UniProtKB/Swiss-Prot annotation:
PANTHER family: EUKARYOTIC TRANSLATION INITATION FACTOR 3, SUBUNIT 8 EIF3S8 -RELATED, EUKARYOTIC TRANSLATION INITIATION FACTOR 3 SUBUNIT C-RELATED
Protein name: Eukaryotic translation initiation factor 3 subunit C
Keyword check for Protein biosynthesis: yes
Provenance organism: Aedes aegypti
Residue ranges of the region described as Disordered: 1-31, 157-289, 852-910
Length: 910
């Protein structure tokens, strides 16, 4: 063994001494233990370092999981983070005085933003796996609960998120110091092991000058020499395997200082060279945008600026519009600079109008996705530019901005100035962007209120465009801009209309109804397309119904025949039709026309999807019922929140109207087997309540209406009105009406009347006669009203009775069968049907395979039996004839019984 090691040492000496030959490293260092392992001191870390390192590692894992959207692993890491933070709380309390370290707050803020972003991306959530989707919901709930303790810290962090983390700086300094210590502590023998690291450093710094290269390579040669010297310095195996060899401390310290100085000099030279490169004009090129060389340049310093030059430059800038690599933001800046140049050189209002119109178009083009709203900063700039453009057009009568003007015929220097463009299209796009901004905001937040304030500005812009279009005299464009004005006016309630009806205001006062009438009449007369006229009629009906002009709204509906042709219209027009019919039903209910209100609302409520039909939201459906594209299109059709109609109010009006119609009808046709349902929805609600074994006190609006219906069936109007009109129902429904007290009084009056009719229908077989004053006292109605109701019932043949005026009584005639008789007749009919069905089944089982001549023989045998009374037919035919005869006998017997009962009732009545 000793000879083997000695031989290895001599080989290394000989190979290291030869410079010309390149030979592999000797095998001797494989058996030497690096002094780095033995010489490194054991570092005792504090509790703070341990806890902070654990937190940092978990945060690093969370950031990695965020990149790949691994929600399951992120949930696990978040739970580990909470546990690690709990362990670190004593350290934070002691060292940081209870202040949470900034790197933890930064991680929580980043995680909160990430969770909110993923949660709001509904399309992306649908693409998540089932496990990730479930983990996302759990993570969101736990995170929202956990960060309540960090609200103040998060708020401070979001005020200055770019500030550096103190703990991270300390850790970086510590890591640098530790790395320097490792470099200094390592002995010369370890340099052979770290040879590759030094080569890598040379590769990074090979771009420096030759002197740097020579210095680095000198260092490498020194290290090689030192390593070879170390390998030869051990004269025996014992010295080689000693834990620590003797070394010269003075030389080691000098080597450390020299190495540190060389590293510092190389870093300074590298920074200096990079700064020189930046000064020479290098720039970072973004692959998604065109470079500055590709962008159009402004005018030269001494160039002569005139109209043609500016227009040519404008065309050059706008030529890049719509191209893939065009920087839209830079394009808007170019146009604004061009406008400033035009204003400086006084090139005229026509050039300024042309440039402003192109700026408006460029702002519209900034957002490439049509379905998404534009940013708020662009929205505010858009409003400013359009207002300035319209103000410029109205101030100059000589400027004509029209899409019918060709580019070759544009005129900027002499009046009349002609510019190609369409201000109406820009305003229509502005209105659509305003609607998208409203739909994007949370309707219950202050942002929605702030955006809604912009409607005043948008309405004023439309009003100014109306003046400009009216000045041009184009009927088609006038109809279009009138319809935009109607869309902002038709759903708004004007209290001056009702004050004018009550003559509280002079007759010359102009109200929104007068303005709507003027605008709609113009569209009726001048529009050449059915769509604008249809939308104008529907908006007109909506506005009339909103202000209780029931008869005008009803006449417009009947004369326009929209209910027959609306199915061929586009979806937005159909949505407007549904909104109009809903508002018309509310108007009919306020006027006491319960039947008309029910007819207007039945089509909406029967489907069970009034929310979708009114474009006020999407109802969750199964996966295959609605695709992502359909859902996206339907979301674009949704109405802004401030234009919504209260769905609970609609449903309550529909159910109350159905109750007032259905309950008396059910009492009048209690034993009618062919009774039809007036309202299927109300009938289902009533039946589902009756099927319940235990019914508690009503809580929801539907339960109140069902409880009121049950009370009305017994003629208890007081309990019925209590269920319909109470504090809870007032807050939910009735207080939403204008003049709510009048609506409540009307409703109680109808409940009394329909309860009286139901009472007479239900208990008419109990009374022989009943006093009119008694009924008036029971239902708290005037005698004249009770007399009128009973007279109508007698005339319509709903109640078989007669009025005795001298005694003020109602004499009831029992022309209808009693309850027992009616049930007996129903039982006999059902038994007869059962016998017929059984015999039919028996014939099908036995068959008629042995009949002579098929159907012809069967008919001939039956005819012979009837004419000659011969019993020569088969048993099947005989049973058929016997059944027919028995059925005829039963019918005759029932007819005789009815006649006999009718005669007996008439005799008793006389």
């Amino acid at each position: 063994m000793s000879r083997f090691f000695a031989g290895g040492g001599s080989d290394s000496d000989s190979e290291s001494s030869s410079d010309s030959e390149v030979v592999a490293r000797p095998a001797a260092p494989q058996f030497t233990f690096s002094d780095e392992e033995e010489d490194v001191k054991r570092v005792v870390r504090s509790t703070k370092e341990k806890r902070y390192e654990d937190l940092s590692n978990i945060i690093k894992n969370i950031r990695n999981y965020k990149k790949i959207k691994d929600m399951s692993s992120m949930l696990t890491s978040f739970e580990e983070l909470t546990r690690a933070h709990t362990k670190a709380l004593p350290v934070i309390t002691k060292v940081e005085n209870g202040v949470t370290p900034r790197f933890i707050i930064r991680a929580l803020a980043e995680l909160e933003d990430f969770i909110n972003m993923v949660w709001e991306d509904k399309e992306g959530r649908k693409n998540l796996s089932k496990n990730n989707s479930k983990s996302l919901g759990t993570l969101r709930q736990k995170f929202r609960k956990y960060i309540k303790d960090f609200d103040s810290d998060l708020k401070k962090f979001r005020e200055s998120p770019d500030a550096a983390d103190d703990d991270e700086e300390e850790e970086e300094k510590k890591e640098e110091s530790e790395s320097e210590d490792e470099q200094h502590v390592a002995p010369a023998a370890a340099k052979a092991v770290s040879f590759k690291k030094e080569v890598k450093q040379v590769k990074v710094e090979k771009d420096d000058d030759e002197s740097d290269d020579s210095i680095d390579w000198d260092m490498d040669s020194d290290s090689d020499e030192s390593s070879s010297d170390e390998e030869t310095q051990y004269t025996s195996i014992r010295e080689r395997f000693l834990k620590k060899a003797e070394k010269d401390d003075g030389e080691d310290a000098e080597n450390k200082k020299e190495k540190k100085k060389l590293q510092k000099d190389s870093k300074d030279r590298l920074k200096k060279k990079r700064a020189e490169d930046d000064d020479e004009g290098w720039e970072v090129v973004n692959g998604n945008r065109s470079t500055s060389a590709e962008q159009p340049k402004m005018f030269a310093k001494d160039a002569e600026i005139d109209v043609n030059v500016v227009i040519n430059k404008l065309n050059e800038v706008m030529a890049a519009r719509g191209k893939k690599r065009t920087d839209r933001k830079l394009q808007i800046e170019f146009l604004r600079e061009l406008r400033t140049i035009a204003d400086t050189h006084n090139l005229g209002d026509a050039v300024a109008a042309k440039i402003r119109f192109n700026i408006v178009s460029a702002i519209f083009d900034y957002n490439p996705k049509v379905s998404e709203p534009m940013k708020l900063e662009h929205w505010s700039k858009l409003l400013e530019e359009i207002q300035a453009l319209i103000k410029l057009l109205l101030a100059n009568d000589d400027i004509v901005l029209s899409e019918t003007i060709l580019e070759e015929n544009e005129e900027y220097e002499t009046a009349p100035y002609k510019i190609r463009g369409c201000i109406l299209t820009a305003v229509e796009r502005l209105d659509d962007e305003f609607t998208k901004l409203l739909k994007e905001c949370d309707p219950h937040s202050n942002d929605y209120v702030d955006r809604l304030k912009d409607e005043v500005t948008v309405s004023s812009v439309i009003e100014q465009v109306v003046k400009y279009i009216e000045r041009l005299g184009n009927d088609t464009e006038t109809c279009r801009v009138y319809l935009r004005k109607i869309d902002h006016l038709y759903y708004k309630f004007d209290p001056n209309v009702l004050k004018k009806k009550k003559k509280e205001l002079p007759a010359s006062t102009l109200t929104s109804v007068d303005e709507m009438d003027r605008l709609c009449r113009f569209v009726y007369a001048k529009d050449q397309t059915d769509r604008l006229r249809t939308r104008a009629i529907l908006s007109h009906i909506f506005h009339h119904a909103l202000h209780d002009n029931w008869f005008q709204a009803r006449d417009l509906v009947l004369m326009s025949h929209l209910q027959e042709t609306i199915h061929h219209s586009d979806p937005p027009t159909q949505i407007l039709y549904n909104r109009t019919m809903a508002n018309l039903g509310l108007c009919a209910f306020r006027h006491g026309n319960v039947k008309d209100a029910h007819q207007c609302l039945v089509d909406l409520m029967m489907t069970g999807k009034p929310k979708e039909l009114l474009a006020q939201g999407l109802v969750p459906q199964r996966q295959n019922e609605r695709s992502l594209e359909q859902e996206k299109v339907e979301k674009q059709r949704q109405m802004p929140f401030h234009m919504h109609i209260n769905l609970e109010l609609l449903e309550c009006v529909y159910l109350v109207s159905a109750m007032l119609l259905e309950i008396p009808y059910m009492a009048a046709h209690e034993f009618d087997a062919r009774r039809r349902m007036i309202s299927k929805t109300f009938y289902q609600q009533l039946r589902s309540s009756e099927r319940q074994s235990l019914v508690g006190p009503p809580e929801s609006m539907r339960e109140h209406v069902v409880a009121a219906a049950k009370a009305m069936r017994h003629g208890n109007w007081n309990a019925c009105s209590t269920f319909i009109v109470n504090k809870k129902m007032n807050v939910k429904v009735w207080d939403l009406f204008y003049e709510a007290d009048r609506v409540r009084e009307m409703l109680i009056k109808f409940i009394k009347e329909e309860s009286l009719r139901t009472y007479l229908f239900t208990y008419s077989n109990v009374y022989a006669s009943i006093s009119v004053p008694y009924l008036a006292e029971m239902f708290e109605l005037p005698k004249s009203k009770v007399h009128s109701l009973i007279s109508k019932m007698i005339i319509n043949e709903e109640l078989m009775a007669s009025l005795d005026d001298p005694t003020e009584t109602v004499v009831l005639h029992r022309s209808e069968p009693s309850r027992l008789q009616a049930l007996s007749m129903q039982l006999s009919d059902k038994v007869t049907n059962l016998v017929d069905s059984n015999e039919r089944i028996f014939e099908m089982k036995q068959g008629n395979f042995f009949q002579r001549g098929g159907n012809q023989g069967y008919n001939r045998d039956r005819q012979n039996y009837r004419n000659q009374n011969q019993n020569q037919n088969w048993s099947g035919n005989r049973r058929q004839d016997n059944r027919e005869n028995r059925g005829n006998r039963n019918q005759n017997r029932d007819r005789d019984h009815r006649k006999q009962h009718r005669v007996e009732f008439e005799e008793k009545a006389e």
